[in-house]
Amino acid sequence: MEHSTEIILSRVKISKNKLLKFLTLLRIVMTTAIPKAFEGIVEVDETYLGGKWINKRKHVKLRQKSKRGRGTSKQPVFGILCRSGQVWAELIEGVEAEDLQPRIEKQVKKGSTICSDTWRGYTGIAAKGYVHRLVNHGKHEYSDRKGNHINGLEGFWGYLKRKMAAKGGIRKSRLHLYLGEYVWRYNHKLLSLKEQENMLNKLIFKHIWSEN
């Protein structure tokens, strides 16, 4: 899956249509492998996916402004990273408290420590049973002496964007599948290829069984 369709086709005897269907199936089952609820110290943050402004088509340029970060018209993604190394991420519609905090409550156990920047979408999360630690990026603060930071999650965002960029363009309707793929790859990066293959085979079997 890290190679182009053309390269894979040159190595296996299968039609392009069947290959594309199989790759789609792999990405579908990867999206079902949701990590168990995190606990301990976790990092939360959002990012935005989309091509560079210079590559936008003219009609897109005319209807939207060139912005970075919150307020941009790009696709927002919300992520949660546990300091153990596991990450969870999901495409979201907005970045306000009503978009972010229900997802935190679902994916992070009460009593855990939430590390975030000072975005208003996280205001009030401490009242919901969490310890909340802030990192003020506006003051160029990326960590404090107590280990409160979101550097791990920002590292994942960098990994995700490099992988997405290497694909050369992804349809919005399929964006969630590629997000699921790279979350899965990141969470299982320490496994051997054989171990990853065995896990995927189990996921495929489970998916096919549930469909029947």
Regions found by a protein language model. Give the residues of each.
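Residue-level recognition of single "structural anchor" positions
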Residues: 1-212
